[in-house]
Amino acid sequence: GSVVASYPYDDSPTHRLTGVYSKSADDEVFKYLAKAYASHHPIMRTGKPNCPGEEAETFPDGITNGAQWYDVEGGMQDYNYVWANCFEITLELSCCKYPPTSELPKEWENNRESLLAFIEKV
């Protein structure tokens, strides 16, 4: 996990593991939506999730193009965009995939304003 808003494409023509910006035709719209979420999140907006073992990982403005972060061939985000015209972003909300129940109220507070801002945009 991490704390970042990721947008298409997750796959790239070269299928390199990381570092390839795979721009969609709607790249500016996706960046706008990802920033709408990230800019209201207290951790995501810093671009420094500081996840254990990945402390050096950073995301400018708290967002990333999926394939630039890591290549995912055949992912749902790309499939939905290409085949269903669904503008989908992926939200990584925690360094921990399954945070303990005791942390859920804090996670809600971290994400509430982001979620409302995102809903207003879409």
Label the model's feature ranges.
Residues 1-122:
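Metallocarboxypeptidase
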